[in-house]
């Protein structure tokens, strides 16, 4: 019989061999759901370096040492691929990115308790510690939050801390599931989990990453160079497994785009670009990207991101839509962030009926229909005490 901790959970077992991992997976595949978390380091690499995988079933909790010599993680992939076992995460994006990189595809049958908590009225992007405390009354020891998980050996305290991320998660999942079923909101969660099940969510197009830098120019030739060198940096950072900012900072990319250097000497004069970088393979790659962008016909050059040019939404209308969004979400006890973003409200204010999530499914019921009515003048907003009142026009 497995020993249990003071909290009533089985004591965690450290897994360091493929044989033991295979046995764990065989047992966990008989369960309806398994809670999962990871510990990793990423300060020195582009791709996360997976250090631990924590798994919890009904009667066992394991911490898999993914850095143990000779361990093969293929059995873990079998568990992740099993559509009959729900894989429960909290704030799953980074965990899923790791598994996508490791196995080439995403786990089947996902559930994210952070998404579920937003639907269930626990606010925007509620943290795991706060959610555990709200639902179970338990408080998680944070002493090892900033551990170097790549260092070995692991202490018993580190193993216990890592295990707590999946033991309490089982209880949180069950309580949230009951609440969502009772309120008829499971389908609300499903639509957002579909995004997490799409590999494109974790593989941004290198050709669009330049837009994140929000360059303050409408010069299309400069934007074309910026697009080319930003895409080069992303692919090169992935290839050599170095953080993109360590390879070449955004500020340097913007200056390269503005000056479009044509040779090594000009490139080496850019702030943040060393002579060694300019003379090496990386410098050659940058100069080739600049030259290719300079040779593009005008019609192939990018334009500034939407919102930087052209008509702007009415600030007053956007402000009213934000007030209405807050009122609708308070009434339905759902996080506003999950219903509509600021960019969504800007588009709604500008376009007759844009193709946006807020005008589809449950979001339209909660907010979208009323937002259209407000925009079209079929609804007025007033104040009744401390509450926003909607008045048919």
Curated annotation (Swiss-Prot):
Where found in the cell?
Cytoplasm
Family matches, as SMART domains: 35EXOc, HRDC
- How is this protein annotated for GO cellular component? cytoplasm
Pfam families, alphabetized: DNA_pol_A_exo1 (PF01612), HRDC (PF00570)
Give any GO molecular function from the UniProt entry.
ribonuclease D activity
Tell me which EC number(s) this protein carries.
3.1.13.5
Substrates-to-products reaction catalysed: Exonucleolytic cleavage that removes extra residues from the 3'-terminus of tRNA to produce 5'-mononucleotides
Q: What Gene Ontology terms for biological process does this UniProt record contain? A: tRNA 3'-end processing
Identify the main location: cytoplasm
Annotated HRDC domain ranges read 219-300
Q: Where is the 3'-5' exonuclease domain?
A: 14-181
Keyword Cytoplasm assigned: yes
Q: Which cofactor does it need?
A: a divalent metal cation
Give the HAMAP family listed for this entry: RNase_D
The record's similarity note reads: Belongs to the RNase D family.
Q: What does this protein do?
A: Exonuclease involved in the 3' processing of various precursor tRNAs. Initiates hydrolysis at the 3'-terminus of an RNA molecule and releases 5'-mononucleotides.
Q: What is this protein called?
A: Ribonuclease D
Q: Which organism is it from?
A: Gluconacetobacter diazotrophicus (strain ATCC 49037 / DSM 5601 / CCUG 37298 / CIP 103539 / LMG 7603 / PAl5)
The gene coding this protein: rnd
């Amino acid at each position: 019989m497995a020993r249990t901790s003071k909290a009533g959970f089985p004591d965690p077992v450290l897994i360091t061999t493929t044989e033991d991992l295979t046995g764990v997976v065989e047992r966990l595949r008989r369960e309806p759901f398994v809670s999962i978390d990871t510990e990793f380091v990423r300060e020195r690499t582009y791709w996360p370096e997976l250090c631990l995988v924590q798994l919890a079933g009904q009667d066992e909790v394991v911490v898999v040492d993914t850095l143990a010599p000779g361990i093969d993680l293929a059995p873990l992939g079998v568990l992740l691929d099993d559509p009959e076992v729900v894989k429960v995460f909290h704030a799953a994006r980074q965990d899923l990115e790791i598994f996508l990189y490791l196995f080439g595809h995403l786990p089947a049958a996902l559930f994210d308790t952070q998404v579920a908590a937003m639907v269930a009225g626990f606010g925007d992007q509620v943290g795991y510690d706060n959610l555990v405390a709200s639902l179970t009354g338990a408080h998680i020891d944070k002493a090892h939050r900033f551990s170097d998980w790549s260092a070995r050996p692991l202490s018993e305290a580190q193993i216990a801390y890592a295990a707590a991320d999946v033991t309490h998660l089982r209880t949180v999942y069950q309580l949230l599931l009951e609440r969502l079923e009772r309120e008829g909101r499971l389908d609300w969660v499903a639509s957002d989990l579909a995004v997490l099940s799409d590999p494109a969510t974790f593989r941004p197009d290198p050709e669009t990453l330049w837009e994140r830098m929000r360059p303050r120019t409408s010069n299309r030739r400069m934007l074309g160079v910026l697009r080319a060198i930003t895409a080069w940096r992303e692919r090169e950072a992935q290839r050599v497994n170095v953080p993109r900012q360590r390879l070449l900072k955004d500020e340097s990319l913007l200056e390269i785009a503005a000056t479009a250097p044509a040779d090594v000497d000009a490139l080496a004069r850019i702030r943040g670009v060393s002579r060694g970088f300019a003379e090496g393979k990386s410098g050659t790659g940058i100069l080739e990207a600049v030259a290719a962008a300079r040779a593009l016909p005008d019609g192939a050059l990018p334009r500034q991101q939407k919102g930087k040019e052209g008509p702007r939404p009415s600030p007053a209308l956007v402000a009213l839509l934000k007030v209405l969004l807050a009122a609708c979400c308070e009434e339905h006890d759902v996080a506003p962030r999950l219903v509509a973003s600021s960019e969504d409200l800007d588009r709604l204010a500008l376009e007759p009926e844009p193709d946006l999530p807020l005008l589809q499914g449950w979001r339209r019921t909660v907010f979208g229909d009323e937002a259209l009515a407000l925009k079209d003048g079929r609804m007025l907003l007033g104040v009744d005490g401390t509450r926003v009142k909607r008045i048919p026009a």
